[in-house]
């Protein structure tokens, strides 16, 4: 199965590639400014992963265009910047996080849906980000699948989202980090998804 990894010039990209390869995926990595949508389509990928990166979704090359073009055609997973790109592609706002996270772990609560199916709840994850998708601006077509919580249990920041009808999901944290629990299992759940629609 050919998996296209859109690399947003991030040092973590090849850690993600390694995890996916260990799970049996054939991964082709392209930089976010290396190919047009037509060139990507010509390679006939079965699924796409949009990588983390040091920039904002607006600066992530072909990432948003690829999400919108392939939406409904094949499964798409966004990691960190890729997650934010999904949020922005469908109309959400990406804003400064309340607190910058650089290699910090957090317990994340989830709805046992999609890539989170069967994972620990809460799940300990590793976060490297200064931006988040603003919950109040999430469009109707997207739903929150995972979040950090305030002390009273209310939702703090979005840590996972997915499209309500299409096979498109994002995670704000880094499943490929050694300190994230069940990272392989999360990616394995993505690799089980087929087709563009749920």
From Swiss-Prot:
It catalyses: chorismate + L-glutamine = anthranilate + pyruvate + L-glutamate + H(+). Residues 2-198 form the Glutamine amidotransferase type-1 domain. Keywords: Amino-acid biosynthesis, Aromatic amino acid biosynthesis, Glutamine amidotransferase, Lyase, Tryptophan biosynthesis. InterPro entries: Anth_synth/Amidotransfase (IPR050472), Class_I_gatase-like (IPR029062), GATASE (IPR017926), TrpG/PapA_dom (IPR006221). Pathway: Amino-acid biosynthesis; L-tryptophan biosynthesis; L-tryptophan from chorismate: step 1/5. One of its GO terms (cellular component) is cytosol. It is an enzyme of class 4 (lyase). Disruption phenotype: Cells lacking this gene fail to grow on low-ammonia medium but grew on the high-ammonium medium. L-glutamine binds at residues 53-55, 84, 130-131. The active site is at 80 (nucleophile), 174 (for gatase activity), 176 (for gatase activity). One of its GO terms (molecular function) is anthranilate synthase activity. One of its GO terms (biological process) is tetrahydrofolate biosynthetic process. Pfam families: GATase. It comes from the Bacteria. Part of a heterotetrameric complex that catalyzes the two-step biosynthesis of anthranilate, an intermediate in the biosynthesis of L-tryptophan. In the first step, the glutamine-binding beta subunit (TrpG) of anthranilate synthase (AS) provides the glutamine amidotransferase activity which generates ammonia as a substrate that, along with chorismate, is used in the second step, catalyzed by the large alpha subunit of AS (TrpE) to produce anthranilate. In the absence of TrpG, TrpE can synthesize anthranilate directly from chorismate and high concentrations of ammonia. This is Anthranilate synthase component 2. The lineage of its organism: Bacteria, Pseudomonadati, Pseudomonadota, Gammaproteobacteria, Pseudomonadales.
């Amino acid at each position: 199965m050919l998996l296209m990894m859109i690399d947003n010039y991030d040092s973590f990209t090849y850690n993600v590639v390694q995890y996916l390869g260990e799970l049996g995926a054939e991964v082709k990595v392209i930089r976010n400014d290396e190919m047009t949508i037509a060139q990507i389509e010509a390679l006939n990928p079965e699924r796409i992963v949009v990588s983390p990166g040091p920039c904002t979704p607006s600066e992530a090359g072909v990432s948003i265009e690829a999400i919108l073009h392939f939406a409904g055609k094949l499964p798409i997973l966004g990691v960190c910047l890729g997650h934010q790109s999904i949020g922005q592609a469908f109309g959400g706002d990406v804003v400064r996080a309340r607190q910058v996270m650089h290699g910090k772990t957090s317990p994340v609560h989830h709805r046992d849906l999609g890539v989170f199916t069967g994972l620990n709840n809460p799940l300990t994850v590793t976060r490297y980000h200064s931006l988040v998708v603003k919950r109040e601006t999430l469009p109707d077509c997207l739903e929150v699948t995972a979040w950090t919580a305030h002390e009273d249990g209310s939702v703090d920041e979005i840590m996972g989202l997915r499209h309500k009808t299409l096979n498109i999901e994002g995670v704000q944290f880094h499943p490929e980090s050694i300190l994230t629990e069940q990272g392989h299992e999360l990616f394995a759940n993505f690799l089980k998804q087929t087709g563009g629609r749920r």
